[in-house]
Amino acid sequence: MLTKYFVFCFSLVVFYQTTNISKACSFNCGSSHVITQKDPGGPATKYGNRYFTVEFPEKERPNDATISLYEDGRRQFFSALKSRGNMYSIKPKGNSETFKVSKNPQSTILDKQLSKGYILSYLYYDNGTIKYNGIPKPGRFKRDIDDKTLFFTHSTGKSIISYIVGHAICKGYISSKNEPINWPLMSKTLYNEQPLINLLNMNAGDKHTVNEGASRVMGSKAHHRDMDHITIAKLLQGTERKGNDIFYNNVLTDIVASYVAFRADNDYDKLLKMVFQDKIKIENEVHFELHRNTSSISEKLYGKPQIRASYSFMITRGDLLRVAVSMMKDYQNKTCVGNYLRDIQKQANSWPKYRPSKKNASLYLHNYAKKYGGKFYFKFNQMEDRNIMATEGYNGQNIMIDMDNSKIVVTQSAATAWDQRTFILNVIRYGKLPK
């Protein structure tokens, strides 16, 4: 009888604790689970038929040999871009500031992700100090990841383009974020005379012109970066805006990047150096991919940045953190660029892919954002009243900034196969790393 009473009491305690944990963690509880690799310890696998092994499909769970193969492929792709004149580079000025770094606190599940999972770089910055600085241990991959390793930003580069737009406005190259697009190159397209903010907010009414998944323009078989913006403008000739819903796509931000080059004109290189060298103070060279020249060499604009710029940056882990810190300081200090960031936050629109309860929602940061504007995500579930800004790039190249508490998480990863709640959202929400 006493045993039954003890079991009953113990069950009540467990029920009470579980219920309270559930209430305390009704959202964003996260998971420490390391998603199992396909054929761990096996040979490398090449997905698809692309010549360069650059990026995995999001659904794949590659093993370490495959991750190594794709890192080699990225390096080969970088070299090919550079040798063919399809890369724009900004050299460091030698004025980078060294981060203050403290000893990593114990975080068993984060360590496990770095040793067996898909996170390749994890930086947690707290009030001027890197509190966690994590990369896989030497020897895990064919090439060790270090502070010189270049990563694609993917769509996080869209947010960097927006940050450059802010600088272009503050330096007078662009009159305001509401400036009508008056660009001869795009004068016969749907973008003509639209306010720039429409393009920044991804509600330019261009859903009928772009294949969302394949980044193809007007049914073209070629990827949009395999043609310059003269060719793209010809494909778009005669198009008109349809609707004002958010249509998230890759083509539009490259058009914005090239618009900045058009407005800055001969000062374009000067503008980029001001942003990356003088403001961000990069430590290593930063690159971005250029659209291929496909128009006639007799074209007046042939080869110029305004027909070739893109958001596809290649940057080191430390310099991506420097980008985030620069954004945070501008915002906090209410500089001209900081006020631009505040304005796009105020004018952000409802994000149509807010779905925190969806199955596997935790694999994507954007599932927890309620607002999108100026190529940033805002208003995160359970943190709506806080000034938090985030970026998200394919396969986990992400930034989240807590403007109120000076905390930043920057990640680079190999695959879409880890819990964004545990390693990003929770860290910003609670201000501490997972145990």
Name each region found by the language model.
Residues 1-26:
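Classical Sec-dependent N-terminal signal peptides that target proteins to the secretory pathway
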Residues 252-259, 311-333, 397-413:
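Active-site-proximal alpha-helical segments within enzyme catalytic domains
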Residues 144-148, 211-293, 311:
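Catalytic-site signature segments of enzymes, centered on catalytic residues
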Residues 294-305, 348-409:
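Active-site Gly/Thr loop motif
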Residues 171-207, 263-310, 315, 332-333:
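Active-site helix/loop module of the DD-peptidase/beta-lactamase fold
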Residues 151-176, 199, 256-260, 320-323, ...:
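Active-site SXXK
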Residues 118-119, 134-155, 165-168, 182, ...:
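Extended ligand-binding groove/face enriched in aromatic
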Residues 22-145, 170, 174, 427-435:
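N-terminal leader/targeting segments and the immediately adjacent pre-domain N-terminus
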